Structures are given as structure tokens and as C-alpha cells.
């Protein structure tokens, strides 16, 4: 290697200031899933609290007064697991302990490697099992699931997931289906995480599940928004690509205090991220769980320029290379947008080179008119992680060989070797980012629900991303 590299590794960030390290509390059922009509939802919920005010051991059950949480869940895995009898919890779109246990049980029964994680192979096997059971009349009704002496998801049924442990008042799950339009079916349940009680009181959450085609759900958009209690904060977790033209999405956007997405699951990352960036200009707050995954990279970048001699050289950066897992470049674009927004770079050109490596080249102009060259490279990996498009490594450098701004951040051996092999006459500071255990979707979502208002850094970074993607569209 022609360059000089000063290695600082490994570096691990702990988030003790963000979340508790204690286990989630036990979860008990106040009302098992019950099918109801749309018109009877509120009256049935009121009845739950009237008949369940006094619990066993003198505990009083009361509804939380925190926030409403709506989940748009197009993935049918949870619903299929319930229909086949593997899952007996609420349909809430959240992959908590109970869902993990249910997936493991189903995988064992279907002859799929029991990882507790969903996969295309598992989804296909689950869909085939559902179709067979439906054809043979072996699907379980809600009542039958409740009366089963043993539940396959029992291993995780006594533990509240991260979201339930945060004591939401009401969780509304929308499950769009692909069957014939037969209106919308509703189901209610209520669960209580057993935390430290105050005056023998259990703080419980209502679950409302609505199933129907996309058109059917859109027709009752007014009913759905009314179910989000108007006096409490309203969060919407849209577990799909943003659909600016879909009437239900527009309605939820206008009624929610915050829309939460995860750009790592976008079907068309560039087009969907463009839509998302355009929404950031609206009054409603937008949050992307994929942005939260960049925190270790951002903190290490900032830390690299803490020494005075490096801080004074930050304006000399005019080269940036970012490697990411091929398939989704949302994280790479957002990190680039963050750096550019901090250094006041303006994007001026964009080009794309398809191939084994997906190469995106963006040219910026600094405030002093200095040209900046950026390159994003999608690397094909044999062993990809759970999150498509995770950053692998990045390099900040300068054409000024005397500038002390050379920085390499990498997440593994391959990433470090590739960046260090670039050579050059600069002295590079190298740091390794160690994978964190608390970066999964459920935990990121739990932290997001504890935040209020807009994230100025995210908004400013997405303004740069929007400008980059508009250049891409123009090209």
C-alpha cells in the first residue's frame, strides 16, 4: 500500500443513554383476539374495560394514556402464522419474542431451517401450507386458536415486545389482502405488560386489526383516522414504500404526528427515497429507521475530526468513497447527504454505471467553488446481513496530500482491505465499526417512539438527497 494508515480498532458504541438493558416485562392477555363488526369497535372496547376493571390478585386493569400507534402491514407472515395456528398473539406487525417463537415452530414443521427469521423460502412454504389448509378446510378460527391447550409460540408468549413495553394506548394494524374485495374485517384484543405497578394498577394496550383489500381500507379511511385517539400523539409505521398517490397514505400523513418508514425495505430504493425526500418538506414529521442505523458511522466520523489539527483540515476533504451491500443504496445516499449538508456542499452532477459493482458518481461544489468527487459502490456479498444495503466501508480524502483529513471507516475485514488498498500519499486514520446488537428494527422503532418532533439533521441531509436524486432523474 502506498498510503500510511493509523489503525484504531475495534470501536464499539454502547447506547445505554438511549435504552434500558433490562429484559422486556412479562405480558398477559386481558382480552384474547375477538372478531367484531366495524360499527361495534368502540363499544366492544369499552366493554373490555368495564368487565376487566378488577383483575386477579386485586390488580386493576386500565388503558394507557400515552399514544396511538398505527401499523400498515402488507407482509402476510404474521396473519398466515395465526391462521395456521402457530401464532396466537395480536396482529400488530411487530417481530417480537412471540413472533420469533412462532416462526421457529412453523419452520420446524415445514422443514425449513429454524432460524426464527423470515425469508423468501419460508414465506413460500408458509403460503403453500396456508393454501393447502384452506383447500382442505383446516384453517383455525379465532375461537379455535384461543382454546388450543398448547400454543407453538408459547416460548415467547410471556414476554412483551419492545413496543408493548413502551405502553402505547392503542395499536391499530392495517393488513391489506390480495383476495376479492369483501369489505373490511375487524378484530380486537388487549394485553398488559406487567411492570412495576402503581397502586395495584395494570397499564394495558388495545389492539385493533383491520383486514381488507387496499381499496377496501381506503374506503374506510375516515373510520381509521377516527380510531387514532385525537387527544393523544399519533404515530404511523408505514411498513412499505411510500405511496404518495394512495389516498389512505395521504390521509394518514395529514392526521399523524409522525410517519415512520424503513428505507431498507423499499422496493425501488431510488424512486421511493425520492418520494420520501419530497415528503420531508411537509409539516408532518418523517422518520426513517434506516437513518438511525447510520448513527455509529456518523459518531465515528465526527470523532475522527475531534483533534484540532484534523478539525482545521475538514475543509480540505474533496474525495469521498462509500461501499455498501449491493441492492439498496439508501443508507449510502443518506450518509453522503449528511456529510454534504455539514460541509455545505451543493450537488451539481450525477452518473450511474451498472454492472457487478453498482457505481454512483456524484460531483459537488464546495462554498469556495472547490469540486468534490463522491463515489458510491454497491458490493455483491455472498453473506448479506438482515438489513439490505448496510454500509461496509467509507473513505474521506483530499487531493491536497498535506491535509490531515484522511479517514477510513470499515465494518469488516473485506471493507477495510478494500479501502486501505486504495493507496495514496495521505496519512489515513482507520477505525473499525463493530456491529451492534441493538440495531434491529424492533429496537430502533422502540427508541423512535420515545422521540418528539422533527430531526433537523435528518431533514437537512434529506434535502441534499433530494437534490442528488433530482439530478439522477434529470439525467
From Swiss-Prot:
Q: Name one Pfam family in it.
A: PG_binding_1
This molecule's function is given as: May be involved in the functional assembly of glucose 6-phosphate dehydrogenase.
Return the PANTHER family for the record: OXPP CYCLE PROTEIN OPCA-RELATED
Q: What is this protein called?
A: Putative OxPP cycle protein OpcA
